[in-house]
Curated annotation (Swiss-Prot):
Quaternary state and interactors: Homodimer.
Short name of any one Pfam family annotated for the protein: Glyco_trans_4_4
Stored NCBIfam families: mycothiol_MshA
EC number: 2.4.1.250
Record: residues binding 1D-myo-inositol 3-phosphate: H14, D25, A26, G27, G28, M29, N30, K83, Y116, T140, R160
EC top class, as a word: transferase
Transit peptide found in the keyword field: no
The name this protein goes by in its record: D-inositol 3-phosphate glycosyltransferase
GO molecular function: acetylglucosaminyltransferase activity; D-inositol-3-phosphate glycosyltransferase activity; magnesium ion binding
Binding site for Mg(2+): Y315, R316, A318, T342
Glycosyltransferase found in the keyword field: yes
Keywords, comma-separated and alphabetical: Glycosyltransferase, Magnesium, Metal-binding, Transferase
Length: 431
């Protein structure tokens, strides 16, 4: 019988839970770490989140909520350091984490949970020093990303592949967002199936919900707040602007829609809510140039990343949220949109096949041909009753994705990891 888990060290080297999602390297992983930590703390589990300090102005320790502390570790230059360069700073980061733990009595942490391969390298060392279970979440995997690269995207380096293979072999448990990710861990990385736990991410259903229980009425209110026309056909993209997310597919689809029906120009609005992460046309200025070349610059509205309450208003205002990513380990944007009552049109890749129920809460499209997206989006415009059915189905589906259920399952994974370590220490195989 495992002893209760009282304190967890969470490691997120390359992105801080305090960063605004949608900027730089901050995205769904940030939301995941914050939501899990808050809910663990509410259940009496203390969480220390170690992340790299990116400014000398940051305090050594910042309280996120009661029971959750963010610990900033100085390792390398504070600014102008790309994620691809962080592997060279892992020794300094690991040293900082080990020093922080050494300031406490032995056994201060009951478990390590690392996020992304860089953090896994740190956890791999700390696990040996502390004698505690290591649970690791990949969030994305190099072999999967390299098999589905977007045009203009850069392949993940060999050092990342090696790092992921090392943490796969060294972790006591691996957390997969979906059954497909679990299969990829086993088939591509040789993970032990018995050490892979599927934990579906959640949505904050108290925040992401139809306003006052209304679907169309809630959309009207949101559009007034955002200064959007009531009669617009609003297509929404949310996320970091990078090749992987393929926002250009939406712009090209919108151009095809207007070309096929010039009268649509009076009503079509494409909103892109997100910040730069990458280069070329995947940056806002690159997308703006593309919109001009396509002749739809007047239809596209670019908005910076925004706090979650405002983001929920964008979801409510939209007719459809479009997620044309080349790969997603889950697809938090799709889940949030559905929770607000807005159906999703998404690429049938990765975790999006779990996050969206095709034909019930949205539409999944094979491939990334803008013509296919234009056809689906045009049909949804022309069939408002179908949109309404999908909107209702989206809300129903999202209700199965609350964060509390995620934490319930994650605690089961933590317990399994502790049982494995305890059994190994006792010289017996875990049951």
């Amino acid at each position: 019988m495992s002893l209760p888990i009282a304190r967890i060290a969470t490691i997120s080297v390359h992105t801080s839970p305090l960063d605004q999602p949608g900027t730089g390297d901050a995205g769904g992983m940030n939301v995941y770490i914050v939501e899990i930590a808050k809910r663990l703390a509410a259940r009496g589990v203390e969480v220390d989140i170690f992340t790299r300090a990116t400014s000398r102005e940051l305090p050594p320790v910042a309280e996120l909520v009661s029971g959750v502390q963010v610990r900033h570790v100085v390792s390398g230059p504070f600014e102008e350091l790309d994620k691809t360069e962080l592997a060279g700073e892992l020794c300094a980061f690991t040293s900082g984490v080990l020093r922080a733990e050494a300031a406490h009595d032995p056994g201060h942490y009951d478990l390590l949970h690392t996020h992304y391969w860089l953090s896994g390298q740190v956890g791999w060392v700390a696990k040996q020093r502390w004698g505690v279970p290591l649970v690791h979440s990949m969030h994305t995997m190099a072999k999967v990303k390299n098999a589905a690269l977007a045009e203009g995207d850069t392949p993940e380096p060999a050092i990342r592949v090696l790092g992921e293979e090392q943490v796969t072999a060294g972790a006591d448990r691996l957390v997969a967002n979906t059954a497909e990710e679990a299969r990829q861990l086993v088939e591509l990385y040789g993970a032990d199936p018995d050490r892979v736990g599927v934990v579906t991410p959640g949505v904050d259903l108290s925040l992401f919900r139809p306003r006052n229980g209304l679907l169309r009425g809630g959309a009207d209110q949101a559009r007034r707040r955002l200064g959007l026309p009531r009669d617009a056909y609003l297509l929404l993209f949310v996320g970091r602007i990078q090749p992987l997310k393929a926002p250009d597919v939406l712009l090209r689809a919108a151009a095809l829609m207007v070309e096929a029906d010039p009268a649509l120009r009076e009503h079509l609005v494409v909103a892109v809510v997100g910040g730069p992460s990458g280069s070329g046309r995947a940056r806002p200025e690159g997308l703006q140039k593309l919109a001009t070349e396509l002749g739809i610059a007047d239809l596209v509205r670019f908005e910076p990343p925004c706090p979650q309450p405002l983001l929920a208003e964008w979801y409510r205002a939209a007719d459809v949220t479009v997620v044309p990513s080349h790969n997603e380990s889950f697809g938090l944007v799709a889940a949030e949109s559905q929770a607000c009552g807005t159906p999703v049109v998404a690429a049938a890749v990765g975790g999006l096949r779990t996050a969206v129920r095709d034909g019930e809460s949205g539409v999944l499209i094979d491939g990334h041909d803008p013509a296919d997206y234009a056809a689906v989006l045009t049909r949804l415009r022309d069939e408002p009753r179908r949109r309404e059915r999908l909107a209702a189905g989206a809300v129903r589906h999202a209700r199965t994705l609350g964060w509390d259920a995620t934490v319930d399952r994650l605690l089961e994974v933590y317990t399994g990891a502790k049982d494995t370590v305890n059994a190994t220490a006792a010289g017996v195989l875990p049951r």
